[in-house]
Amino acid sequence: MGTLQGLLLWLLLGTGGAQAPRGPLRPLCRPVNATLAAENEACPVCITFTTSICAGYCPSMVRVLPAALPPVPQPVCTYRELRFASIRLPGCPPGVDPEVSFPVALSCRCGPCRLSSSDCGGPRAQPLACDLPHLPGLLFL
């Protein structure tokens, strides 16, 4: 190795130029509070409630030569531990189940998206909201 190359390598490594940033640029995968909506077409009202969901950044990779190799599965922020809570929609007619169950995130992890328990789609054009008149303000954490 030439003197100039050695000097450049020493400067790069000595000044920390080859190190990754110390803190994340985006929030990592973790439980966060979110307001969701619950409704049933047979019941007269919709309820908005606050619960904890998994959200945040998961490190991912994209192949430089995508045609040569199969795609790399991209991890998503998903539940590690969860519990289920439920709310009762008021004013439902007899014979209609007024209970709506939903997951409450206790801890999260980066992993494959499981369609059985997660919505693996991208951002929505419109946030989830009530189509019916709603009763706001329930909190489930």
UniProtKB/Swiss-Prot annotation:
Disulfide bond residue pairs: C29-C77, C43-C92, C46-C130, C54-C108, C58-C110, C113-C120
Gene3D superfamilies: Cystine-knot cytokines (2.10.90.10)
Keywords: Disulfide bond, Glycoprotein, Hormone, Secreted, Signal
Signal peptide: 1-18
GO cellular component: cytoplasm; extracellular space
Glycosylation site positions: N33
SMART domains with a match to the protein in the record: GHB (SM00068)
Source taxon at top rank: Eukaryota
GO MF annotation: an example: hormone activity
Any GO BP: G protein-coupled receptor signaling pathway
Localization in the cell: Secreted
CDD domains: GHB_like (cd00069)
Chief location category: secreted
Function: Promotes spermatogenesis and ovulation by stimulating the testes and ovaries to synthesize steroids.
Family the entry assigns: Belongs to the glycoprotein hormones subunit beta family.
UniProt subunit comment: Heterodimer of a common alpha chain and a unique beta chain which confers biological specificity to thyrotropin, lutropin, follitropin and gonadotropin.
Protein name as annotated: Lutropin subunit beta
Organism: Oryctolagus cuniculus (Rabbit)
